[in-house]
Amino acid sequence: MARRRHSNRRHRRGSFGFLYKVLSMLVICGAIIAALTLFFRVGTIVVTGQERYTEAEVVAATGVEQDDNLFLLNKYTVANNILAELPYIEEIRINRKLQDPLLIEVKECGDPLAVIQDGFAWLVSPGGKIVEQRGASEAGDCPVISGCQLLAPTVGTPLALATEYATQQQSLLELLNALESAGMLDQVEGIHLEDLSVLVMDYGGRFSVEMPYGADYPRKLRALQAVIDNLETNQTGTVQLTWDNGEVHFIED
């Protein structure tokens, strides 16, 4: 009997000890969370990488205010706010370190191309996002994409062509990506999708380049560059990259 009472007392002491440890951990965790919530605040916001926008415009687009809590800051919400307000920005990195400035690194898209439609010039980034709406006469030096119809164009949304242009849309996006990756986009003066059998690109002020839809565009662009490298600087004409066997034909003007 005495042994049983002793065992019960020891069991109660063990239970209280465990409870004490749990409560202590909860108190410590609560204190840490309270400290993070109360003391780690947004002081300075530093923005890098912007060209078209000012630092103040990027900061305003974040929706973050001075003295906002860093610990509770949702980086994904901040990034989405910036993308929604400033469409030329395509990549964002947010470095949130406690007791340091909030660092925001942005990357803007390359020079856009224009689709002229219904009296407007819709500027499209190389990544396929509509980044700006202008009057048709204000397209400036933007290369023009012709022979297609935008479907419900809205700034900040991905380029979408009408259903009958599905093949052209996919090929256009793949070509733009290949041009940007190859560093050749600045030589493009226009892309024409009117012909359903061949895509035509005005290039370098000297060439009309014909390519099939659905092609391996990185490979086609390497072939194009090889042709150009073997021509005289005053030669102009049509470069045909439409052959399945990889042949390249140059028809001089």
Regions found by a protein language model. Give the residues of each.
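N-terminal functional module detector in eukaryotic proteins
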Residues: V42-T44
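Extended, alpha-helix-rich binding/interface surfaces that flank or overlap catalytic cores
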Residues: V47
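Short extracytoplasmic
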Residues: Y53-A84
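Charged, solvent-exposed interaction patches on well-folded alpha/beta domains
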Residues: A2-A34, F40, E57, A61, ...
